[in-house]
Amino acid sequence: MSLEEQFLTDLEQYPDTVSIVHSYIKLGETMKALKKENYTDVCKEEQELRKSMEGINIEELIERNFDTILNGVIRKKDILSFVNVLSYYYKDCQIIYNNFEKIVSAADKIGNLRDLRDLYIWIVHKPNGKEVFIENIDFILGLEHPEAIIDLIELVKGRNKELDAKIEKALSSHSNGIAKVMLERASEDNQIDNYVDTLEFMIKEILKSENKNYLDITRIAVGNGEFSFVYKIGDKILKVGSPRGEFKMPNHRRILQPLARKAFRNRLGKTMACVEISEEVDTNIEQKDPEELYKLWKELRDEGVIWTDVTWENVGRLKKKNIPSLNGEEMYVEPEAAGFKNKYKGKPLEKGELVILDTDFIFEENSPYLRWFNFGYAKSFEDRYKKENALDKEEEER
């Protein structure tokens, strides 16, 4: 039996296609290394193995039998593992690009939007992958799930009006799928699908308010720790992510006031994902004065609120008054509806003021859930605050 016949027999007999492919590629690489080193003192079995592999190129073997291999990969729903194995040994990824349509069609057929989206992200970060993705955009838009490109719109839009129109049509006709992609990235709980319609409605309302199209949805960042995906829609910011801290938190005027902030919970009451819509702020802070940051932090601390995730990445300057708006109108949002425990004290902050954007780790000072971190300014600010309070107390007692 030839090596290729043995390979096909193994694929037929064993369910773990990716492991079989991995083993044969590794075998081929080992044989090449041995041949290069010209080892002659080998056992009879290895001599026979070398003989069976003479003239055999494993990469070409995989290419010839790619359809058979892919059928096995589809059965296991293991596309990402498969391409990772191929790219590990074939760094130029050419074998993947040669079979791009087959691989993407298989992932699309499986229908796991999170994996399909991750596959596209994976491809564009490989050598020449961005160009391959762009070249194949017409093919991708014709698949059953074109919405999986939602995080990569910036790569393909603006090239010509015809393509932009095609992208918009594909996305707008799969608006439910866009919401599903975002939520499935935040949670693997099957019950997250119960909130797809809710997020779809929220996105449509933002687009309407900002007079924008689906083509204008831009992923601008992956939040700190990769817990949130952040999208810009006009002057609004949409965050979709996994929960990190307590959802309910104390309110303060130094916190960016959201238009909407929702916790999506399963039937057991466990939070699967958090969604927040807020106004865009200026995060390009050129003069980063720690004293200004301490002043902000101290305002909260004086009111019994502790913010423990203090970094410049988590603040920004207001572009307008700290009041959310919709359709050009300022909106009053009940604190409880936005996950706050209370109304904040004082007047809304004006344009140019520094506010907190990331609210995952804001606690009441006596909270049993309070968490400190070894990074950022919070610990040093707390130490300074206690020393200053102790000095003030000494002054009063004199």
Predicted regions and their residues:
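C-lobe/activation-segment region of protein kinase-like
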Residues: 292, 298, 302-308, 316-398
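Conserved protein-kinase catalytic-loop position immediately C-terminal to the HRD catalytic Asp
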Residues: 313
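Active-site-adjacent loop/helix micro-motif of nuclease/hydrolase catalytic cores
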Residues: 243-252, 285-293, 365-372
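Non-catalytic all-alpha helical scaffold/repeat segments
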Residues: 2-179
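ATP-binding glycine-rich phosphate-binding loop
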Residues: 177-178, 184-234
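ATP-binding glycine-rich loop module of kinase domains
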Residues: 223-252
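Conserved structural core of kinase catalytic domains
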Residues: 254-293
